[in-house]
A protein has these predicted regions:
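Surface-exposed binding/hinge segments that line
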Residues: 112, 146-188, 206-208
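Aromatic- and charge-enriched surface segment that lines or borders ligand/interaction sites
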Residues: 98-143, 158, 164, 247, ...
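Alpha-helical secondary-structure segments
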Residues: 50, 126-133, 160-166, 200-201, ...
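N-terminal secretory signal peptides
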Residues: 1-14, 25-30
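Detector for C-terminal structural segments
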Residues: 14, 26-27, 69, 208-212, ...
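Gly/Pro-rich hinge or "lid" segments in bacterial periplasmic/extracellular proteins
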Residues: 87-91, 178-228, 232-234, 240-242, ...
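N-terminal lobe/hinge region of extracytoplasmic solute-binding protein
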Residues: 52-104, 135, 197-199
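Ligand-site clamp/hinge motif
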Residues: 220-266, 385-386, 394
Length: 522
C-alpha cells in the first residue's frame, strides 16, 4: 500500500492570493473525477459491509452537535452530507455545494447549492436547509463547532439555491470549515435527529448506541456516481483492538480501524487481508493537564513533564515505529505550516528534575488513563511513569473505565490521556484545541498573543508571514501549553482483500470515514 506522503495546507485547492482576490467557482468534476478507488475497477452493487470500529460510546447521539469521535462521524456520513468534502489529498471539493467563490478579502462568500437533491423524506434541498444547519452551531449552542464559525457575521439567502456568508474577518479556509463533520445538512427546522432525514446514501434501520448501527441503502440511484454500492452497512462498536483484529481474521467483519501497530506486520502477512496506512495522518496522542489548576499552573511543572517523557521509547514499544514524535501541539508534519525548524524536547531527566525543583514539587502527579481513550494509552503512561523516575519525580497512573471516559474524565480530570484527530488546515488544528474559551480547549490554555496570531494568520496573504505566524503559534504551545503530545500516529486500517475503497486519506481513517459510501466488493 502506498503511503500518504504529501498534502497541501493540507491542501487548499486554490492559490491563496487568487482565492482571496476572487476565486472562480469550483465545479462537480473536481469532486469525483479522480478517486483512487476507481483505478481498482468498476464499482459493483450489492453485499453487506460489516465494520468493526473503535471510537464511540453508549452515550453517542445522532445530533450533529454532539459528534466527537470516529464512529459518530462514520454513521453520520451514511445518512447526511456536508456542503464540502475533503478528497484523499486533503483538497476541499464540492459536495452539496456544487461551487463557491469569494469576493476580494475573503469576507464575503457565495455558495451555490446543488439542485435536484432530496432528503429521505422527499423534501428538496434548498438554501433554508443549509442556513438552518450552519446555524445549529452558532449562537446559544454547546456544539464544539461553534468556535469555527465565530467569525460568521451573517448568512443570507440569495435564492432558493444560493447563500452568501459574510465574515467579520476574511478567512480563505471557509470551505474547509464547512467540511467539518459537525456541519452536516439537515432539513430546515429539524429538532429530532433520532430518525435521520438526510441527503446521504443510506437510511437508519437499527440503532443501539455503544453496540451497533445498521443502515440500508436508499432505493434508486444515489446522486454521486459510483458511490453507495452496498445494500446495507453494519457498524459494530469494538473498542478492544485485539477483538477487532480477531473479528477481521475470522471474517466476522470486512474492515477495522485503528489497527494495533504491534500486530500490523503480522496481520499484513495474511493473504486475505490488506492494510491501509496513511503515514502521519493519524491521531495526535497526548497527556493533557488543566493549566488553571495546581500544580499544572506552574510552567516549570509542565516543562518538567515535557523533558521527563521518553517519547522515542513510547513510539518504539507502543506504536512499533508507526508514528512520529509529537511537538506538544496538534499540527503534524504533513501540514504545510508545520515548523520544521522546531525541535522536540529531548528526554532529559536532569533538566526535568531542575524544573520540578524550581516548581517546588516532584509529584505525585495523578494521570488518569484508559484503553477507552486509545489503544496504548496505559502502556504509554507506564513508560512515562518509568522515565520520570530518573528525574526523581512520581507519576501515579490511575487506570479508569473506558465506559464514559470522554464524558466523565476528559475535560474534567486535571491530567489525563487524550488523542486528537487530524484536521485539514492549521487554523482548524489550533482554533478548536487552544484558543481561549473554546469548548474543546482541554488544557484551558489562554494566551491573548496566541489568540490574536490565530485570527491574523487566517487573512494573511503573504505566505512567508503566514508561515512565521503559525511557527510562532507552535513555539508558544511547545513552551507553554499543558499538552504533552508525544506521538503523531499513522492512520492504520485493515480490511478484506475483496473490499475496494479502503484507501489512505489525508484527514481521517476509513477513507475519511466515508468507506460505507465510497466502497464496494470486487
Amino acid at each position: 500500500m502506498t503511503n500518504h506522503e504529501t498534502t497541501t495546507e493540507s491542501g487548499i485547492v486554490f492559490d491563496r492570493r487568487q482565492l482571496i482576490a476572487g476565486a472562480s467557482a469550483v465545479g462537480l468534476g473536481a469532486a469525483f473525477a479522480s478517486m483512487p478507488a476507481m483505478a481498482q475497477g468498476t464499482p459493483k452493487k450489492g453485499g453487506v459491509l460489516r465494520l468493526g470500529m473503535e471510537g464511540g460510546s453508549a452515550s453517542d447521539s445522532l445530533d450533529p452537535r454532539t459528534y466527537a469521535d470516529s464512529i459518530p462521524i462514520a454513521y453520520s456520513l451514511m445518512f447526511w452530507n456536508c456542503l464540502v468534502e475533503i478528497d484523499t489529498k486533503g483538497n476541499a471539493t464540492p459536495e452539496l455545494a456544487e461551487s463557491w467563490e469569494s469576493k476580494p478579502g475573503a469576507t464575503e462568500w457565495i455558495f451555490n447549492i446543488r439542485k435536484g437533491i432530496t432528503f429521505t423524506s422527499g423534501k428538496a434541498l434548498d438554501a433554508d436547509d443549509v442556513i438552518y444547519s450552519i446555524n445549529l452551531h452558532r449562537g446559544e449552542t454547546k456544539s464544539p463547532a461553534k468556535g469555527l464559525l465565530a467569525s460568521v457575521k451573517e448568512i443570507t439567502k440569495l435564492s432558493p439555491n444560493q447563500i452568501q456568508i459574510t465574515l467579520s474577518a476574511g478567512n480563505a479556509d471557509l470551505p474547509f470549515i464547512l467540511s467539518d463533520y459537525h456541519m452536516i445538512i439537515v432539513p430546515n427546522g429539524t429538532t429530532d435527529f433520532s430518525k435521520p432525514d438526510g441527503t446521504g446514501a443510506f437510511t437508519l434501520a437499527e440503532w443501539q448506541p455503544g453496540v451497533r448501527i445498521v443502515a440500508k441503502r436508499k432505493p434508486g440511484n444515489y446522486w454521486k456516481p459510483g458511490r453507495a454500492n452496498f445494500d446495507s452497512v453494519e457498524l459494530r462498536y469494538i473498542g478492544d483492538a485485539a477483538v477487532r483484529t480477531q473479528a477481521l481474521i475470522t471474517n466476522q467483519v470486512d474492515a477495522i480501524n485503528r489497527v494495533n501497530p504491534k500486530t500490523i506486520d503480522l496481520l499484513a502477512k495474511n493473504k486475505s487481508i490488506k492494510i491501509s496506512r496513511s503515514q502521519g495522518a493519524g491521531n495526535r496522542y497526548a497527556f493533557v493537564a488543566l493549566t488553571d489548576m495546581d500544580p499544572y499552573k506552574s510552567r516549570d511543572v509542565m516543562l518538567g513533564l515535557k523533558h521527563g517523557i521518553d517519547r522515542q521509547t513510547i513510539i518504539k514499544n507502543v506504536f512499533s515505529g508507526y508514528a512520529t514524535i509529537g511537538m506538544d501541539h496538534t499540527i503534524g508534519p504533513l501540514n504545510k505550516y508545520y515548523d520544521k525548524k522546531q525541535k522536540a524536547w529531548p528526554y532529559d531527566p536532569d533538566k526535568a528534575a531542575f524544573h520540578f525543583k524550581k516548581a517546588g514539587t516532584s509529584g505525585p502527579f495523578e494521570l488518569q488513563v484508559s484503553e477507552g481513550a486509545y489503544t496504548g494509552a496505559t502502556d504509554s503512561a507506564v513508560i512515562f511513569q518509568e522515565s520520570l523516575k530518573k528525574a526523581k519525580a512520581n507519576l501515579d497512573v490511575k487506570r479508569v473505565s473506558g465506559d464514559g471516559y470522554w464524558d466523565n474524565v476528559w475535560l474534567k480530570a486535571p491530567f489525563c490521556a487524550v488523542y486528537w484527530g487530524n484536521r485539514p488546515t492549521a487554523d482548524l488544528q489550533l482554533s478548536q484545541t487552544f484558543v481561549t474559551g473554546q469548548t474543546w480547549n482541554d488544557t484551558h490554555y489562554s494566551n491573548p498573543k496566541f489568540d490574536k496570531l490565530v485570527v491574523d494568520a487566517r487573512v494573511e496573504l503573504d505566505e512567508a508571514k503566514r508561515m512565521e505566524m503559525y511557527a510562532e503559534c507552535q513555539r508558544l504551545l511547545h513552551e507553554e501549553a499543558g499538552m504533552v503530545c508525544f506521538a503523531i500516529g499513522d492512520a492504520l486500517d485493515a480490511g478484506s482483500t475483496r473490499l475496494r475503497g479502503l484507501e489512505p486519506h489525508a484527514r481521517y481513517d476509513m477513507n475519511d470515514q466515508r468507506l460505507a459510501e465510497k466502497g464496494w466488493f470486487a
